[in-house]
Swiss-Prot record:
It comes from Drosophila willistoni (Fruit fly). The lineage of its organism: Eukaryota, Metazoa, Ecdysozoa, Arthropoda, Hexapoda. Pfam families: Clp1 (PF06807), CLP1_N (PF16573), CLP1_P (PF16575). The gene is cbc. This is Protein CLP1 homolog. It comes from the Eukaryota. It is found in: Nucleus.
Length: 425
C-alpha cells in the first residue's frame, strides 16, 4: 500500500519494534530523521536530528531496542511499524560470537568464522551487516567474506571477495569497499563452473585465514561469511566445502529447517548450527529484479552514485595488445584427456580467447598474474573493465575502465559471462 508523507509524519516506535518501508519508484527520495530515543539500521546507530536520504530500491527496517520517534518525509510504496522482528535473536548470535572472540583473545588464537546460509531472499546479507556492525561497535575488526557470486556485496557479481571492517556501515551506502581482496570466478552462479568455484573459495579462505595472524585485533575478531542462496544438491555441497575451507565455528541458517537438519547431520559436532527466523520485512525478488540489482552493482563500480560519482575512462586497445583468457575449457570425456588428467581438470584450464563480436558488453577482470604460467586462479584481481565496442575492421576493442589508458604492462584479462550495457549519458 502506497503511503505519501510529502509533508512529513512522526512515527512513535515502542521498544523492540521497527519501522519498515520500501521505495520502488524512480526519482523519489525519502528523508528520515531520528527525533528522539535510540534507533539503528541493520546494526548502525542513527544520529539524532540528522537527515538520512533513501532512494529507489531501498528496503529499510529501522529498529529500536528502547523506543524512539522517527520523522519520515516522502512517498513510499510500503510503510508500516512491526513488533514482529527477529532482532533479539540476531543480537544473541552476536553475543555468542563475542564470547568465542574473548576466548580466542585469551588463548592468542583465531576468532570464530561464522557462515550465514539460507535460500534466496531470506536476508543473509542483512544479517551479515548486522553481525559486522555489532562487532565493530564493541571494538572488533572482523573480516567480511562474500562468496555469493550472484549479487556481489563487496566486488561486482561474478567474483568472491573479502574486506576488513573497521567502522560501522554508513546508513545510506553500507560498508566502504576500499582495498578488497577479490578473486575472479566469471559466472553468475557456482553452477557455471563448480570445480572453479570450489577452487577460488578455497584459495580465498586460505589467504584470509593466514592473514589473521598478522594483526591481533583482527585475529580474535574472526570472519563473517556471506553465501549463495543455492542450498540444494550441488549448492549444498558448495556450502559444506566452504564450511570446511574456512573451518567454520558457527553456521546461522535462515528460514529453512531442512537445511538446518542436513547441516546438523553433515558438519562436525564442534560446529554450532543455529536456526534463525527471517525478518518479516524481507522482500522476495523476481529474476528481473535480481538482474537489475546485478546491473546496478556493476554500474556503481564504474560510475559511483549520486553522493560520490565516478568518471570512468574509455580507450581503444588493439587485438594484438589484448592478452585475453578464460578459465575453463569445453568438457571432454576422460578417454580423450592426456594421460594422468581428468575431465574436471579442464574446468580450471586457462584458455586463450580470440576477440570477436561476441565480446561486446562483457566484463573483463584485470589479474595480478603476469602470465599463464602463474597461478591465475589463485591470483587476485586488480579491477574490472567492460567491452563497449568491438571493431573487427580496425581489429580493436573499446574498453570502459576506472583507470585511464594504457592498460598496465603485461596486463592479463580474464573473460566473464557477466555483461553490462553502458547506457550512461
Amino acid at each position: 500500500m502506497s503511503e505519501d508523507n510529502s509533508q512529513g509524519r512522526d512515527y512513535t516506535l515502542e521498544s523492540d519494534s521497527e519501522l519498515r518501508f520500501e521505495i520502488e519508484q524512480k526519482d523519489v527520495k525519502v528523508l528520515v530523521t531520528l527525533v528522539n530515543g535510540f534507533a539503528e539500521l541493520f546494526g548502525t546507530e542513527l544520529v539524532k536530528k540528522k537527515k538520512y536520504e533513501f532512494g529507489m530500491g531501498a528496503k529499510v527496517a529501522i529498529f529500536t531496542y528502547q523506543g524512539c520517534v522517527l520523522h519520515v518525509q516522502g512517498k513510499m510504496d510500503v510503510c508500516y511499524v512491526s513488533k514482529e522482528t527477529p532482532m533479539v535473536q540476531y543480537v544473541n548470535c552476536h553475543a555468542a560470537l563475542e564470547q568465542f572472540r574473548q576466548e580466542a583473545e585469551e588463548k592468542d588464537a583465531c576468532g570464530p568464522v561464522a557462515m550465514v546460509v539460507g535460500p534466496m531472499d531470506v536476508g543473509k546479507s542483512t544479517l551479515c551487516r548486522i553481525l559486522l556492525n555489532y562487532a565493530v561497535r564493541v571494538g572488533r575488526r572482523p573480516l567480511y567474506a562474500d562468496i555469493d557470486v550472484g549479487q556481489g556485496a563487496i566486488a561486482i557479481p561474478g567474483n568472491v571477495a573479502t574486506i576488513l571492517i573497521e567502522r560501522p556501515a554508513s546508513i545510506e551506502e553500507g560498508f566502504p569497499k576500499t582495498a578488497p581482496l577479490v578473486y575472479h570466478f566469471g559466472h553468475k552462479s557456482p553452477s557455471g563452473n563448480s570445480v572453479l568455484y570450489n577452487a577460488v573459495v578455497s584459495k580465498m579462505a586460505e589467504v584470509t585465514l593466514n592473514s589473521l595472524s598478522g594483526n591481533k585485533r583482527t585475529q580474535s575478531s574472526g570472519i563473517i561469511v556471506n553465501t549463495c542462496g543455492w542450498v540444494k544438491g550441488s549448492g549444498y555441497a558448495h556450502l559444506l566445502h566452504a564450511a570446511r575451507a574456512y573451518g567454520a565455528k558457527a553456521i546461522f541458517v535462515l528460514d529453512q529447517e531442512r537445511l538446518y537438519n542436513e547441516l546438523l547431520r553433515d558438519v562436525p559436532p564442534n560446529v554450532h548450527v543455529v536456526l534463525l527466523p527471517k525478518s518479516g520485512g524481507v522482500v522476495e525478488r523476481s529474476k528481473e529484479l535480481r538482474h537489475e540489482s546485478r546491473d546496478q552493482r556493476i554500474k556503481e563500480y564504474f560510475y559511483g552514485n549520486i553522493r560520490a560519482p565516478f568518471y570512468p575512462f574509455s580507450f581503444e586497445v588493439k587485438f594484438q595488445d589484448l592478452r585475453l583468457y578464460k578459465i575453463g575449457a569445453p568438457p571432454l570425456p576422460d578417454s580423450c584427456m592426456p594421460i594422468g588428467m581428468k575431465a574436471e581438470d579442464n574446468k580450471t584450464k586457462v584458455v586463450a580467447v580470440t576477440p570477436t563480436q561476441s565480446l561486446l558488453h562483457h566484463i573483463l577482470a584485470l589479474s595480478f598474474a603476469e602470465n599463464t604460467d602463474d597461478d591465475v586462479i589463485g591470483t587476485n584481481v586488480a579491477g574490472f573493465c567492460c567491452v563497449t565496442n568491438v571493431d573487427m575492421d580496425r581489429q580493436a576493442v573499446m574498453l570502459l575502465s576506472p583507470q585511464p589508458r594504457p592498460l598496465p604492462p603485461n596486463a592479463l584479462l580474464l573473460w566473464s559471462e557477466l555483461q553490462f550495457m553502458d547506457n550512461h549519458a
